[in-house]
């Protein structure tokens, strides 16, 4: 029997141990997609207690607590921080098999030196030890440095001032790149509440009178240029469905004018608007050498009552099953045939799409980057051992495994960098099993190089970080 979460955790062969310890463990981190706050990095936020850094804003943990029968007052309500901490400890104690069980232990081990098993019995000791470390100076920047993070790409609205990115760019005391990522979901949300208000804000920040679709595109173009000047090299799109329906610019201009008047547009009109706008954005990204991330098949805000109470991103999303093969293929092809397909990273929350993505990759590759079209890392509800292995095995079966740009946190928590360790252990174990089974040669120079590339080097080159 193996020890619980020791140095051999998830490493089932000697090759896996050697790959992890000699090649993966000490590689730096590029967290190229996350939702952490650049303001909190800039201001070097400190935390009063473990609850603030461990549970605040972490809807993964909130969701588990609800699934364990915890009352909402101990999750997002007005209970004390210790009561919330204890409620989570009780929930996670019985959540064996859930990746949160491993992540939570890794977070306590790596940042607080707490190796006690998370349990109600150990809760007072964990609370005391973790809080002492926080009080001794474990700030946001210290967490980032301790994690060996070299670059972070946040998720930012086109109208964002990027004030804190600019300040961090000039801050010579902090040697980590904090770069914006362009997230134009609100620009595409023509049927969403508050759309005209958002367009007004875009007009203000871009200093343009947006009274036509052409002016709207000009404003988006200017914001992309601004993001680029601050160091942005990646965009991100959360697609509740993959839009593809051709339309002329005149037709889209009419649709946009209709929306500006506050009129409801049909689903067909929305799809035409999104298709045309996405193609415009894709061409712009390609011209600047950006990468475009496409996150598909999330069904968001399923619980109306809780959405009205807490808002989005609070733990009430699920996997969707919209068909992606047809529209995704047509969208990529529409850009490729004009020579304007940017580097693209494709994620689906639905693992049934894995072979769709895995086979589409090979249809649109190019020489602009090593692995120009990427099968994105296992995402969100797939962010566990089985999901990661399935994603990597699919990529290996259908494409070029060694071109993979590896892991990201996609997180709102600064403690989530341990997910990179989790991924690296699983990566090394997978390769180790291939060696054990005689499926790949026991060539540590080759395997070590592939491992280091997937952990860091591929992403460094793909995003042109220069690290």
UniProtKB/Swiss-Prot annotation:
Name of this protein: Uronate isomerase
Taxonomic lineage of the native organism: Bacteria, Bacillati, Bacillota, Clostridia, Eubacteriales
Membrane found in the keyword field: no
GO biological process, one term: D-glucuronate catabolic process
Pathway assigned in UniProt: Carbohydrate metabolism; pentose and glucuronate interconversion
Enzyme class: isomerase
Record organism: Clostridium acetobutylicum (strain ATCC 824 / DSM 792 / JCM 1419 / IAM 19013 / LMG 5710 / NBRC 13948 / NRRL B-527 / VKM B-1787 / 2291 / W)
Record key words, sorted: Isomerase
Domain of life, source organism: Bacteria
EC number: 5.3.1.12
Similarity annotation: Belongs to the metallo-dependent hydrolases superfamily. Uronate isomerase family.
GO MF terms, alphabetically ordered: glucuronate isomerase activity
Reaction(s) this enzyme catalyzes, per UniProt: D-glucuronate = D-fructuronate; aldehydo-D-galacturonate = keto-D-tagaturonate
């Amino acid at each position: 029997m193996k020890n619980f979460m020791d140095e051999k955790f998830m490493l089932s062969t000697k090759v896996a141990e050697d790959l992890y310890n000699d090649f993966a463990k000490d590689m730096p981190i590029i967290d190229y997609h996350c939702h952490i706050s650049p303001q909190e990095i800039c201001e070097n936020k400190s935390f009063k207690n473990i609850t603030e850094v461990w549970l605040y804003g972490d809807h993964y943990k909130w969701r588990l607590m609800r699934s364990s029968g915890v009352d909402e007052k101990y999750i997002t309500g007005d209970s004390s921080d210790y009561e919330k901490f204890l409620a989570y400890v009780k929930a996670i104690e019985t959540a064996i098999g859930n990746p949160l069980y491993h992540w939570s232990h890794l977070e306590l081990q790596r940042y607080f030196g707490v190796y006690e098993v998370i349990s109600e019995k150990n809760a007072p000791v964990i609370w005391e030890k973790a809080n002492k470390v926080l009080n001794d100076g474990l700030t946001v920047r210290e967490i980032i440095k301790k994690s060996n993070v070299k670059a972070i790409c946040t998720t930012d609205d086109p109208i964002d001032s990027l004030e804190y990115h600019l300040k961090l760019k000039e801050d010579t005391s902090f040697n980590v790149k904090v770069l914006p990522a362009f997230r134009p979901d609100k620009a595409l949300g023509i049927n969403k509440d508050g759309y005209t208000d958002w367009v007004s804000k875009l007009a203000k920040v871009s200093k343009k009178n947006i009274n036509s679709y052409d002016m709207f595109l000009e404003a988006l173009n200017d914001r992309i240029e601004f993001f680029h000047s601050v160091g942005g090299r990646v965009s991100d799109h959360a697609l509740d469905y993959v839009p593809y329906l051709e339309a002329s610019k005149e037709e889209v201009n009419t649709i946009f004018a209709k929306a500006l008047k506050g009129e409801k547009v049909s689903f067909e009109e929305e799809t035409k608007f999104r298709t045309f706008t996405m193609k415009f954005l894709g061409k712009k990204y390609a011209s600047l050498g950006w990468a475009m991330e496409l996150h598909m098949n999330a069904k968001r805000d399923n619980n109306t009552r809780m959405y009205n109470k807490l808002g989005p991103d609070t733990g009430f999303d699920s996997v969707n099953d919209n068909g992606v093969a047809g529209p995704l293929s047509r969208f990529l092809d529409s850009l490729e045939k004009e020579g304007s397909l940017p580097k693209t990273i494709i994620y689906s929350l639905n693992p049934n799409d894995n072979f769709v993505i895995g086979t589409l990759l090979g249809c649109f590759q190019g020489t602009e980057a090593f692995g120009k079209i990427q099968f994105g890392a296992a995402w969100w509800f797939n962010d566990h051992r089985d999901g990661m292995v399935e994603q990597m095995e699919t990529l290996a079966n259908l494409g070029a495994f060694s071109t993979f740009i590896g892991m990201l946190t996609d997180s709102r928590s600064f403690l989530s960098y341990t997910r990179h360790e989790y991924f690296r252990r699983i990566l090394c174990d997978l390769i180790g099993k291939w060696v054990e089974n005689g499926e790949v040669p026991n060539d540590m120079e080759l395997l070590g190089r592939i491992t280091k590339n997937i952990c860091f080097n591929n992403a460094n080159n793909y995003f042109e970080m220069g690290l």
